[in-house]
């Protein structure tokens, strides 16, 4: 048996210089509530004899407005952090670059195209640090909550259980976003109840359209103007509401045949109107990296307890770790855990619920939700005290 079947040429030589923006980490955005005084760029030089060479590194920020900030340091270690003061940096979009030079000032290598954006102060500002922890207006948070928490009158109950997030599938169709359409969702009442309970919602903004498979293609071609208006008006209407946690880009896009371009279109739609809240997506195939640039939070949904073919509970941890690999640990993973039953199956018991939650945390989840409050509270009300006990216990993760 061969010990190695890989060809001898199957390796990659690292470039001499690599660089990336590490602070701010999330989308390269500076928010006012960060209190950030310096932008940090991590530069790596692929040479072991650096101290003896006397090489230097220069980081620079350039913008069309003529802002020119520069920082220099010696390249004496394989990894170096360069700090550029940013307190007085005007709002706008910038490009960063790093150059490696020898002792005579000759350019040896350079990295350009690192994007930086300083946004105007927002009412609410949510972002992630380098470890993918969520910050809400500067306060760290470990978000936990529910899909399909559809009852405004149950927000306080969920909050008493230690939970901070809520959701409804009413946000999946444009017509239910529009207050002028009969049968639309009562968004003000629902969101106000969430805010009063100290909770925040991740809101869909009509991603399923009119239910036709070609809806997003038509939307992108400008052939669905009514739905486009309903979707964008909804984001504008509630982007400063205190109960907004983020925008829900899509629910299991691969199962609906969605493409990365369609997902990216939805991301831009939300982000151009509201850069202050993250964008989330649930992926049933959480090892599919095609969608990596179309969300800020990856939500895998491993449901191990089934009528047939149940999986070990450790599959939850395996899913979280696999999702982290998919995004290269560059984005947070908030798994969707099981609080419902498959047809012919059963609900998870108290031990299984707690095990799933803390397996996810131990595997590196930076938040989690349950699917779903509607199914669980309606059909498994006896399990609510256990779910609430777990929710209060999870608050210790913060």
Regions found by a protein language model. Give the residues of each.
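Solvent-exposed serine/threonine-rich low-complexity stretches and specific carbohydrate-binding patches
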Residues: 65-80
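Glycan-processing catalytic domains of CAZymes
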Residues: 5-16, 20-55, 83-86, 90-398
């Amino acid at each position: 048996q061969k010990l190695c079947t890989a060809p001898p040429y199957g390796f990659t030589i690292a470039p001499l210089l690599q660089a990336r923006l590490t602070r701010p980490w999330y989308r390269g955005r500076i928010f006012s509530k960060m209190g950030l005084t310096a932008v940090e760029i991590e530069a790596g030089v692929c040479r072991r004899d650096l101290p003896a060479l006397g090489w230097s590194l220069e980081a620079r920020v350039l913008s069309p407005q003529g802002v020119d900030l520069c920082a220099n340091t010696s390249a004496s270690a394989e990894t170096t952090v360069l700090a550029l003061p940013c307190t007085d940096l005007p709002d706008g979009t910038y490009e960063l670059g790093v150059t490696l030079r020898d002792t005579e000032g000759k350019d040896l290598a350079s990295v350009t195209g690192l994007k930086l954006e300083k946004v105007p102060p927002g009412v609410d500002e949510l972002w992630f640090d380098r470890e993918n922890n969520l910050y809400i207006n500067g306060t760290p948070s470990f978000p936990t909550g529910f899909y399909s928490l559809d009852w405004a009158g149950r927000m306080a109950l969920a909050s008493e259980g230690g939970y901070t997030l809520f959701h409804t599938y009413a946000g999946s169709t444009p017509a239910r976003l529009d207050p002028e359409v009969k049968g639309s969702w009562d968004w003000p009442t629902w969101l106000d109840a969430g805010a009063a309970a100290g909770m925040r919602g991740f809101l869909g903004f009509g991603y399923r359209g009119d239910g036709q498979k070609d809806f997003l293609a038509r939307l992108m071609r400008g052939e669905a103007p009514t739905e486009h208006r309903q979707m964008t008006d909804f984001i504008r209407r509630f982007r400063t509401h205190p109960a907004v946690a983020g925008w829900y880009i899509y629910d299991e896009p691969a199962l609906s045949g969605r493409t990365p371009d369609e997902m990216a279109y939805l991301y831009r739609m939300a982000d151009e109107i509201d850069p202050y809240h993250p964008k989330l997506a649930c992926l049933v195939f959480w090892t599919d990296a095609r969608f990596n640039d179309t969300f800020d939070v990856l939500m895998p949904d491993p449901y191990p307890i089934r009528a047939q073919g149940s999986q070990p509970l450790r599959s939850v941890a395996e899913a979280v770790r696999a999702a982290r690999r998919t995004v290269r640990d560059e984005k947070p993973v908030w798994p969707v855990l099981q609080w419902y039953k498959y047809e012919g199956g059963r609900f998870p018991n108290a031990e299984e619920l707690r095990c799933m939650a803390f397996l996810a945390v131990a595997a590196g989840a930076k938040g989690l939700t349950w699917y779903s409050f509607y199914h669980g509270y309606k059909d498994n009300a006896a399990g609510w005290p256990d779910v609430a006990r777990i929710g209060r216990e999870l608050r210790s993760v913060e």
